[in-house]
Amino acid sequence: MTVQPTTIGIVGARGHTGAELIKLIAAHPQLQLVFVSSRELAGQRVAEHSDGYEGELRYESLDADAVAAKAADVVILALPNGKAEPFVAAIDASRPQTLLIDLSADYRFDPAWYYGLPELTRHTYAGQRRISNPGCYATAMQLAITPLREQLAGPPQCFGVSGYSGAGTTPSDKNNPALLADNLMPYALTNHMHEREVSAQLGVPVEFMPHVAPHFRGITMTVNLWLQQPLTREQIHARYLERYAHEPLIEIVDEAPWVSRIAGTQGVQIGGFTMAPGNKRVVVVATLDNLLKGAATQAMQNLNLALGWDELTAIG
């Protein structure tokens, strides 16, 4: 008996994350990519833009109603912030059973949507067909803070540095290699959307200072944590090992991880664990690929979780 594949479409596939999603879908034994929407690439073969995809599928320029009419089992929205609502409304109206995964910030504060950071929230998944993918910085911050969340004596201070792929493909200062050369570009130093996101998810105020660097991909998140009671480095290291012992995508390392070692990989490295005198302050460093665990890989984890498959299918 032949098992019918689960059909999937991507809206907003021109971007860097869309390209990574296509590779993951191509590697998934139970998924069939049936449409890829991009105004800029409409008419061009997907295989010409993705080295992981083989086939004759072409990019299309699809509005919200056209996406809903495709009747795919799964739709992933990889659109800029503020662009998801028409697609969500059209699918809600005609195909409410569709599994819809939104990679933007648009629904991260909506309690009707499952907030999908599997290592921290999979126990709250209850069959929701609307999944909001966390932000890339927000993923790094939450994974770095959570093992010590109950010990915090004040707001964590998070210094984040991202490769310029995090600024998307629309030209701006933050993804201009000429302006970024020999430079580190701070921006949105208070009230960044990921600061609000992490504060809401963890239930504690978080202070976040993002920067863009000249490298293409990968995030380094350096997190300063003040503790209520002194803890030794060994105790803290053990807490992280215990918390993530059964999480194959999270590796606890001894030294502070390097972003150059995580770029292009699916997981997260957390390490450093540097103590200040008195043992009531620790600095923790997390690294991840913003396009993978910060976006596409996490979306695939959420898809697998929602459909009852092994969470790491196509991820490895």
Swiss-Prot record:
The EC number(s) this enzyme carries: 1.2.1.38
GO terms of molecular function: N-acetyl-gamma-glutamyl-phosphate reductase activity; NAD binding; NADP+ binding
Keyword set includes NADP: yes
One Pfam family in the UniProt entry: Semialdhyde_dh
Protein name according to UniProt: N-acetyl-gamma-glutamyl-phosphate reductase
PROSITE patterns, per the entry: ARGC
SMART domains: Semialdhyde_dh
Signal peptide limits: none
A GO cellular component entry from the record: cytoplasm
Organism of provenance: Xanthomonas campestris pv. campestris (strain ATCC 33913 / DSM 3586 / NCPPB 528 / LMG 568 / P 25)
Keywords: Amino-acid biosynthesis, Arginine biosynthesis, Cytoplasm, NADP, Oxidoreductase
UniProt family annotation: Belongs to the NAGSA dehydrogenase family. Type 1 subfamily.
The keyword Oxidoreductase belongs to this UniProt entry's keyword annotation: yes
